[in-house]
Amino acid sequence: MAPIQYIVEGGHRLSGSIEPSGNKNSALPIIAAALLTEHPVTLENVPRIRDTETLVELIRSVGAAAEWTARNTLHIHAKSIRAADLDPELCVRIRASILLAGPLLARCGEVMLPPPGGDVIGRRRLDTHVLALEQLGAKVTATDRLEFRAPKLAGADVFLDEPSVTATENALVAAVAADGVTYLRNAASEPHVQDLANFLVALGAKIEGIGTNTMIIHGPATLGEATYRIQPDHIEVGSLIGLAAVTRSPLRIVRAGVEHLRSIRMGFERLGIVCRVEGDDLIVPSNQTLKIQDDFGGHVPKLEDQPWPAFPADLMSIAIVTATQCEGVILMFEKMFESRMFFVDKLIAMGARIVLCDPHRAIIAGPSRLRGAPMTSPDIRAGMAMLLAAVCAEGTSTINNADQIERGYERIEERLNALGAKIKRVPERKS
């Protein structure tokens, strides 16, 4: 497929209502976990994006039947699957290919995985996956690929050396099939981890402590069929809050999943953006003074990411762009990935006042008038942040490699245009 370019005419106010897509980071582990059961599974509210399409190709390659029965409904039947060398070209497209380790190990006793791909946002180690699965009885060999073998998985007291989301998900899925009780400690507790756990419960698994950092899994579970609806994407909701703020636009985000938005709302409140909750809808008013809230004692305020339930790393790029349109100075501290802030040079070229202190910290002084500019998206979240900057800038911007944005945001240009944005999606022009 030819690379995609967005041509964005900035300076237009938006208005209306928008519903967030299903959570990509829920959909990927849940699609993989559907391989655990021999019975049919129907998944609703699945975002139809490149990453989910690629994972569907991967599960088909090991023998699962998978069919899109509606725009966002996926039917999976893994009645008979086989251990197979996964296609390296598919695996390199998405980091989520590593999520197949747990379910294939459980069903087939072995799996061979080429190195996973995904965003280039810094060092993303696989050690936690390996250590967790080894504690459940797997033997892991690393050559030009990762080979996992486990004729039988056994419950264990597993302590993760870091609260990695995908390692938690792999260990959780494997533990459901393991013989005996597994204690999964220092586990990630993000909404998408909770979504996966609730899906496994819908299949018949017995899991205690969902939403906490210690889960207890009683295995092996007898799994059946299920129809399951994937929850709204809280990261997309945060992106839409930022979009409404930088364009000074009134926006209603419907069926937003507000129970998972408290830390996100608090983060934006530091930038002077207050949202109103009505039922499960989130309203971003347009008549707000975007002023960064000072810390007590006059210190420069700071917004930092941390593991859930704190402000999520996937929204730091959005928060940086939003801060360029707010009055005041703030320090942004990205703790998790050492390459995620490198896109700020594009914002500086557009007129933003940003000092990149080191790979993890940036100081933003606002407000700044942004001017349209050519950009290239390095990853999903920075690409979406660039799109926010382009929509609020004066003049026209181009965003090359917009395919990266579409890996995480479904039909985003179409949905934003319905609110009043002016975004053209065209094949990328070769220079």
UniProtKB/Swiss-Prot annotation:
Record GO biological process: cell division; cell wall organization; peptidoglycan biosynthetic process; regulation of cell shape; UDP-N-acetylgalactosamine biosynthetic process
InterPro entries documented for this protein: Enolpyruvate_Tfrase_dom (IPR001986), Enolpyruvate_Tfrase_sf (IPR036968), MurA_subfamily (IPR050068), RNA3'P_cycl/enolpyr_Trfase_a/b (IPR013792), UDP_GlcNAc_COvinyl_MurA (IPR005750)
Residues given in the record as phosphoenolpyruvate binding sites: K24, N25
One GO cellular component term noted in the UniProt record for this chain: cytoplasm
UniProt superkingdom: Bacteria
Pathway: Cell wall biogenesis; peptidoglycan biosynthesis
EC numbers, comma separated: 2.5.1.7
SUPFAM superfamilies found in the cross-reference section: EPT/RTPC-like
Keywords: Cell cycle, Cell division, Cell shape, Cell wall biogenesis/degradation, Cytoplasm, Peptidoglycan synthesis, Transferase
Keyword Cell cycle set for record: yes
Localization per Swiss-Prot or TrEMBL: Cytoplasm
Predominant subcellular localization, coarse grouping: cytoplasm
GO MF annotation terms: UDP-N-acetylglucosamine 1-carboxyvinyltransferase activity
Coiled coil: none
Catalysed reaction equations from the record: phosphoenolpyruvate + UDP-N-acetyl-alpha-D-glucosamine = UDP-N-acetyl-3-O-(1-carboxyvinyl)-alpha-D-glucosamine + phosphate
Any one Pfam family match given in the protein's UniProt record, by short name: EPSP_synthase
Entry binding sites for UDP-N-acetyl-alpha-D-glucosamine: R95, D314, M336
Active site: D119
Function: Cell wall formation. Adds enolpyruvyl to UDP-N-acetylglucosamine.
Stated family: Belongs to the EPSP synthase family. MurA subfamily.
Protein name: UDP-N-acetylglucosamine 1-carboxyvinyltransferase
